Amino acid sequence: MIKEWENHFQQYKSQRCGYPKAQEGTPAEGEQNSRKPSRICSDNHPWVVQDFPHHKEDLCTPSPLGIWTAFYKSDPRIALGKYSPMEQEIQHLGGVHTRAARRFLVEKQYKEWRMLRELQKQSADYKRAIELGRDPSSYAVCGPPEKIWTAKVSVPAEEFQTPHREVTGIKKHIKRMQLARALENKQSSTDIGRLSPKTDKFSEEGEDDDTDSNDKANRGEKGEAKFEPTNKREVILNVAFKSEETKSCVVCHRNDRKTFLPVKRPERRITGLTNRNLFPITGFPGDLMLMNQDFVSKGIHPSDAIKIYWLPEEDLFKGRKQRPACCPH
């Protein structure tokens, strides 16, 4: 838009430069020009001002916004600051903090929202963007690629069969449900009598099956009968191997790692093995009271410690004293 305004401004400037030459024509042409209206209406720019300011002083600002406001000065709908129609309406209603002004602003906002919704309904690009956002397959394209392989797995037929104990339990459950349903429907006692011996038979069969299975297990443990699996079947499965996704680094502040409750710091003790014991006596980083406590904890007297510390230097000093002075020749 700004480039368009600047282009119009350049065209208008070039027209104004050629304006004096056009004025040198016949007086009849000048009278015809004076009779023309001050506004020139066009499809693209309905409010183009013919009396555009000739000098630089007449312009509001040299910015494109100032050029645009000067170019469309005669349009009553366009104004900046307190001269805008919306600002004047708010002042007429009593200011921003009044209820009427708030209602007016809410109505304006609602109108803008409705206009935006209508434009979105007309826009094909907006509809396409919504469809892409709702389509879950669009996210899979952006994600890591997946490779699908067919794998052959050989499984014995016994694994597909349900265990015998589970089959008997299922049969018992079915018969119990049938009996309960018969009692709910208040059937005759003869029907109940017909169903109950069957259940007893099934229960006996189940008990026999349990004993048979226990006997088989005992035989297998003893080694009397060995279990031989039947022929294996091949099952084709589609296995999808997902590629490893890159772990996104979580940006966190160093204060987030701290615990909510303050950590109790261990108190510094002088009586134990601390850094104070590693320093020499002259470079002890504390006052005399702390130094005295350190010596008391070690079980030595401060004067003895000083003597021990200065002992090698005193020996050297005594050795130098005992040497005979060399006489100069």
UniProtKB/Swiss-Prot annotation:
Expressed in testis and epididymis. Expressed at lower levels in ovary. Pfam families: DUF5520 (PF17658). Disruption phenotype: No visible phenotype. No effect on testis size, testis-to-body weight ratio, germ cell development or spermiogenesis. No effect on sperm morphology, count or motility. No effect on levels of germ cell apoptosis, chromosome H1t histone association or acrosome biogenesis. InterPro entries: DUF5520. Residues 213-229 have a biased composition (Basic and acidic residues). Residues 16-41, 183-229 are annotated as: Disordered. It comes from the Eukaryota. Dispensable for normal development and fertility. This is Uncharacterized protein C10orf120 homolog.
